[in-house]
């Protein structure tokens, strides 16, 4: 509404249907609720709906050609040549892929250092995990206690024997990958941030608990009533448990070492 009041010419609000498909999966769909946001806004602001630019974007191999054609149609709508829109779309896709590769390379380089000390993987959907007004300063709370806070999408893909082919949601696949890291590396813990009434997250919660049986983990659910105090208490308790487990592990190692010396 603020943008409409500023009398902008257009608002770019695409339907992002599918992201790149992760190896081992058959689809990489985004959230069905967020995909329909452009339609909801169009219905809510009928008198200015012509200002909304809502192309359908899919980044999987099956949809990329259609996406490029959408850029051409978008160009015609704003009064420029179709080929200009297509070329602009191709440049945008190239920059996006370059950024992803640099981001993943950064993750690969940092992984060895991150494994040396207790770290918390923050897993969830990017529109929940990243905006500070939504995540209620969760990364800062973790870092302030001396832990690394690792976004789940920074982690390189771990090959697992588990068949996840029925999982068609891109962000849920990222969470699955994070679970594999927690199971494989003792210094890695996970904080799963979920949205209230999210269907895929509701299913993922049960899988999450089964996979991490015996592990220390944190599950946070965000809704309109979530406040700093509740987050602070739960995250603090989670980190306290991690610290206690490490203290007990250190005591056990020292005890075993002393027994060896005495023997």
Predicted segments, located by residue:
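An N-terminal assembly and electron-transfer interface module characteristic of large anaerobic redox
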Residues: 1-263
């Amino acid at each position: 509404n603020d943008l409409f009041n500023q009398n902008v010419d257009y608002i770019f609000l695409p339907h992002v249907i599918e992201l790149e498909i992760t190896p081992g999966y058959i689809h990489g769909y985004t959230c069905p609720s967020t995909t329909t946001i452009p339609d909801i806004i169009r219905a809510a602001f009928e008198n200015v709906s012509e200002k909304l630019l809502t192309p359908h974007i899919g980044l999987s191999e099956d949809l990329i050609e259609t996406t490029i054609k959408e850029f051409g149609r978008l160009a015609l709508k704003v009064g420029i040549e179709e080929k200009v829109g297509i070329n602009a779309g191709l440049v945008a896709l190239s920059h996006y892929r370059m950024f992803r590769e640099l981001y993943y390379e950064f993750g690969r380089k940092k992984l060895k250092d991150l494994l040396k000390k207790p770290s918390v993987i923050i897993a969830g959907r990017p529109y929940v995990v990243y905006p500070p007004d939504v995540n209620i300063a969760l990364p800062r709370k973790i870092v302030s206690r001396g832990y690394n806070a690792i976004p789940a999408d920074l982690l390189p893909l771990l090959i697992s024997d588990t068949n996840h082919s029925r999982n068609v949601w891109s962000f849920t696949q990222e969470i699955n990958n994070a679970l594999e890291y927690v199971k494989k590396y003792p210094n890695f813990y996970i904080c799963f941030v979920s949205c209230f009434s999210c269907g895929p997250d509701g299913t993922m919660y049960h899988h999450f608990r089964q996979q991490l049986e015996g592990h220390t983990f944190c599950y946070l659910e965000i809704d309109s009533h979530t406040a700093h105090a509740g987050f602070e208490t739960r995250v603090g308790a989670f980190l306290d448990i991690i610290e206690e487990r490490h203290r007990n592990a250190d005591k056990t190692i020292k005890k075993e070492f002393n027994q060896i010396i005495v023997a």
